[in-house]
């Protein structure tokens, strides 16, 4: 397995710890994180950390289950199900993620998904 693919596997696994410092350490200082159905993009490590803190804070559990992952040089893409517990609700969200890697860190992350399951929370 390539280092870039392993980096993303480790990043995905880190989410289950809900440890924001561990998760944010995977990013470059100038990284960009975009949840495609949401605005705006999170630009820079500080903005990404703020978003992740808010997300992790509202979740009682987080698990990302990767079904398929492909690698093309510095690009890693995966199809996964994000299993998230928020209050009494459990969400299983199908996601397509694209990661760009630079110098052993994530420099760009784009997730594509349907907001429907979150809208159902009320």
What do these predicted ranges mean?
Residues 20-73:
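A solvent-exposed, acidic/Ser-Thr-rich amphipathic alpha-helical stretch
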Residues 1-29, 120:
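Short, low-complexity N-terminal intrinsically disordered segments enriched in polar/charged residues
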Residues 78-86:
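Short beta-strand segments that buttress and anchor functional surface loops
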Residues 52, 64-70, 81-82, 94-100:
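Hydrophobic/aromatic beta-strand elements that line small-molecule binding cavities or substrate pockets
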Residues 94-120:
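Short beta-strand edge/turn micro-motifs at domain boundaries
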Residues 11, 23-24, 31, 44, ...:
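Hydrophobic pocket/interface hotspot
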């Amino acid at each position: 397995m390539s280092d870039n693919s392993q980096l993303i596997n480790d990043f995905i696994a880190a989410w289950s710890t809900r440890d924001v410092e561990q998760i944010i350490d995977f990013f470059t200082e100038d990284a960009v994180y975009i949840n495609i159905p949401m605005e705006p993009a999170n630009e820079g490590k500080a903005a990404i950390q703020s978003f992740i803190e808010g997300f992790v804070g509202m979740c009682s559990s987080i698990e990302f289950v990767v079904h398929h992952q492909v690698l093309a040089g510095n690009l890693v893409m995966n199809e996964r199900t994000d299993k998230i517990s928020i209050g009494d609700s459990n969400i299983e969200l199908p996601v397509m993620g694209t990661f760009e890697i630079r110098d052993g860190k994530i420099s760009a992350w784009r997730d594509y998904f349907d907001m429907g399951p979150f809208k159902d929370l009320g």
